[in-house]
């Protein structure tokens, strides 16, 4: 896949950039990825990361990583570390050093003073609730604060008192003086600064007033020389304030903001607030639970950087909000793992088979391919003995004409091996089948049986070639396509989103994994034949108990001939 070519051909933002570069030959493309360090990155952030960094590469420009760290109440160093790790994991490197909006706090304070001196900002003492009430609605204009017409000198002095910590939290704020009757609610005297008494992870206790996102963002873009500030559609109205602040301060550089649709994924929730509810209620294990689309969760589930970037390329960049099929994301990783995953056999729900015509010392070795279509991936050895395991779902006691696997009185072929015939079953005290007694036809290795009818094939593992393992079978967390739109999204939790199985993998394969278990950065992927694609779960695995996460099943349901999306209002 030529990602750059795809971007250039399909991206409407490229048309804007091409026009800008043609009109100004001296212009260098300069963008940024500006996350708030208040949570973990998800698949929606990946779309923005890929867009900004790929555009910077395409136009031989630069892409900064800047943390918009203007709210110390919600921010944490652990999020900064996680975000940097995720960006590097995706294969991108930001320009120069990591930047922080907090590096510009003094300059931002000076810009705020400029607005006050121009009569374009004032210190207000209304509470949050009163500000919301005074703001009005889409149908009714707002009304002026009683503190709106203070003198410039009074506002200068009050803002300085805010900076010195003379007011308590919520007692005062700095607001832009624009138009309380504006058709755009965001322009109705928005708050520019508020008071927060808490230690900041970068500036410590130097500041107790903090700029709002809208004030800091545009000015940080200007300070860094950003040419194209790309954001999602929910910030479309914020552009009015973005441009107003730049126009009314003494900035020397004027970046331009452009909006594209955010990524909305079927059966998924991206809201940090809602994910936290799921965690607090113990519905999911944490921010890296493979049932949610954070990057750490997708990585744990077995998604690769290239599969995520391929997905972001396929969905493209538009101005229309759509609900993207989850099967498209699965298609991207399935297509990759089909080429790269080692083939091996695993038994998730074991049932024992005793081959009565083979003695207890019988042992035969088979050399099998690690990949049927790629000899360069090598081979591995499996052993065949008189006692083996098959999956419980591959046997049926009662006759069923439509059932094509092993049945009592019928035959089946073992993968890479012989045809066996089920003759008798043994049950435990609870009535569950504990053993299947079978006859092994040793004349059928690579040959048809005497009746010339080839039976179906099932996978198996010799009892002497097993290593116990846990298997986590993940499904969608929600049973409706758009849980984000539901007021009570908890009503739509899929109770079968995680099923745990305990069985076996091939011993030699397992022993190789155990040697690497201490290195969490090693990615190991398998196709468990006839089951699906799995990866090792380095978080839950121990040396004496391996845990595998199902990345995706074998069956592809996405129609690659067209990009299927649904209007976001549809469920």
From Swiss-Prot:
Motif 'KMSKS' region boundaries: 269-273
Q: Where in the cell is it found?
A: Cytoplasm
Q: Which residue numbers does the motif 'HIGH' region cover?
A: 35-45
Q: Which UniProt keywords apply?
A: Aminoacyl-tRNA synthetase, ATP-binding, Cytoplasm, Ligase, Nucleotide-binding, Protein biosynthesis
GO terms in the biological process aspect are: glutaminyl-tRNA aminoacylation; glutamyl-tRNA aminoacylation
Q: What's a single GO CC term here?
A: cytosol
Query: What is the annotated quaternary arrangement, including any partners?
Result: Monomer.
Return the protein name: Glutamine--tRNA ligase
Q: Which organism is it from?
A: Buchnera aphidicola subsp. Acyrthosiphon pisum (strain 5A)
Q: Species lineage, top-down?
A: Bacteria, Pseudomonadati, Pseudomonadota, Gammaproteobacteria, Enterobacterales
Q: Which gene encodes it?
A: glnS
């Amino acid at each position: 896949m030529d990602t750059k070519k795809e971007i250039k051909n399909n991206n409407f933002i490229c048309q804007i950039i091409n026009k800008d570069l043609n009109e100004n030959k001296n212009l260098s493309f300069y963008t940024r990825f500006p996350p708030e360090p208040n949570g973990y990155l998800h698949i929606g952030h990946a779309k923005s990361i890929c867009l900004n960094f790929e555009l910077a590469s395409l136009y031989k420009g630069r892409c900064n990583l800047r943390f918009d760290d203007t709210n110390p109440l919600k921010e944490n160093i652990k999020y900064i570390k996680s975000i940097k790790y995720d960006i590097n994991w995706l294969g991108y490197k930001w320009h120069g050093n990591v930047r922080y909006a907090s590096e510009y706090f003094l300059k931002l304070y000076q810009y705020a003073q400029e607005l006050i001196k121009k009569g374009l900002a004032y210190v207000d003492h209304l509470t949050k609730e009163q500000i919301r009430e005074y703001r009005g609605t889409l149908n009714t204009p707002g009304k002026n604060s009683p503190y709106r017409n203070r003198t410039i000198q009074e506002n200068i002095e009050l803002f300085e008192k805010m900076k010195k910590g003379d007011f308590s939290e919520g007692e005062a704020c700095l607001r832009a003086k624009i138009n309380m009757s504006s058709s755009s609610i965001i322009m109705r005297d928005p708050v520019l600064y508020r008071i927060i008494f808490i230690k900041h992870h970068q500036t410590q206790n130097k500041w107790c007033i903090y700029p709002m996102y809208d004030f800091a963002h545009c000015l940080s873009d200007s300070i860094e020389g950003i040419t194209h500030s790309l954001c999602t559609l929910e910030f479309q109205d914020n552009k009015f304030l973005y441009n107003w602040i730049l126009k009314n301060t003494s900035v020397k550089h004027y970046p331009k903001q452009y909006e594209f649709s955010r990524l909305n994924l079927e059966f998924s929730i991206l809201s940090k607030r809602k994910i936290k509810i799921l965690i607090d209620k113990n519905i999911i294990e944490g921010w890296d639970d493979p049932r949610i689309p954070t990057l750490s969760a997708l990585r744990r589930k077995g998604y690769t950087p290239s599969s995520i970037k391929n997905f972001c390329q396929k969905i493209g960049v538009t101005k229309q909000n759509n609900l993207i099929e989850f099967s498209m994301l699965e298609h991207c990783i399935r297509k990759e793992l089909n080429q790269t995953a080692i083939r091996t056999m695993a038994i998730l729900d074991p049932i024992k088979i005793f081959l009565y015509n083979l003695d207890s010392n019988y042992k035969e070795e088979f050399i099998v391919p690690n990949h049927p279509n790629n000899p360069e991936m090598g081979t591995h050895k499996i052993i065949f003995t008189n006692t083996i395991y098959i999956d419980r779902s591959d046997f049926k006691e009662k006759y069923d004409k439509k059932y094509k696997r092993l049945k009592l009185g019928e035959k089946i072929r073992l993968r890479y091996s012989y045809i066996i015939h089920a003759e008798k079953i043994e049950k435990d005290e609870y009535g569950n089948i504990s053993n299947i007694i079978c006859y092994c036809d040793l004349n059928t290795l690579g040959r048809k049986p005497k009746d010339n009818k080839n039976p179906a094939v099932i996978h198996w593992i010799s009892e002497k070639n097993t290593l116990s393992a846990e298997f986590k079978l993940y499904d969608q967390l929600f049973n409706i396509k758009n849980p984000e739109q539901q007021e009570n999204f908890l009503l739509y939790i899929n109770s079968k989103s995680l099923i745990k199985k305990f069985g076996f993998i091939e011993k030699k394969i397992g022993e190789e994994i155990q040697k690497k278990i201490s290195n969490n950065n090693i990615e190991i992927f398998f196709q468990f034949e006839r089951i699906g694609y799995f990866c090792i779960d380095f978080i839950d695995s121990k040396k004496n108990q391996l845990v595998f996460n199902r990345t995706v099943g074998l069956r592809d349901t996405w129609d690659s001939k067209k990009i299927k999306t649904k209007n976001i209002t549809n469920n």
